[in-house]
Amino acid sequence: AFSGKSVTDEILDRKILKGTLSSNVDDICKTVYVNLPVSESIEGFKQKRYWPITEKALREGVVNALVHRDYAISGASVRIFLFTDRLEIRSPGRPPNSVTVEKMKIGIRVHRNPLLVDVMEKLHYVQKAGLGIPMIFSEMRSLNVEPEIRIEEEETILSIPLARKNG
């Protein structure tokens, strides 16, 4: 997690995970959630919390990055950057074959690592339906923010703006 909007800002929290795929998904999601800015308000007699990213969108983004990354790129790793205005999930490699950003948004699927997808399906992390990216966009649109997918050099980046309490 960074103190501002750039990687040149102060690092507030940094973790390097070397566990199993499933434990890394869980640990990444927990670490991000601990560092997210949470808004609170009183509604009636109850306190209500507003999270800037839904749990489903976060988990799906992390799972996609780990399962669909290009493991042939030596020395590269999935990187998660939490800034004050957005979360960036950076996955090594460009999309495989003829997959484009637009095709990802509508759920076209090509599994770069089918064995990993099978394992994660058996562990109930994925459904193999190609609906992860459309679900992330739907979840975040429900909070009135628009995620972005972009390709930079040899990385696929999912950028999710942090929602504010009133959109």
Each PLM stretch: what is its role?
Residues A1-D26, I53-N166:
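Conserved beta-strand-loop-beta-strand hairpin that lines the nucleotide-binding pocket
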Residues G4, L17-Y50:
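Helix-hairpin-helix/helix-loop-helix acidic hairpins
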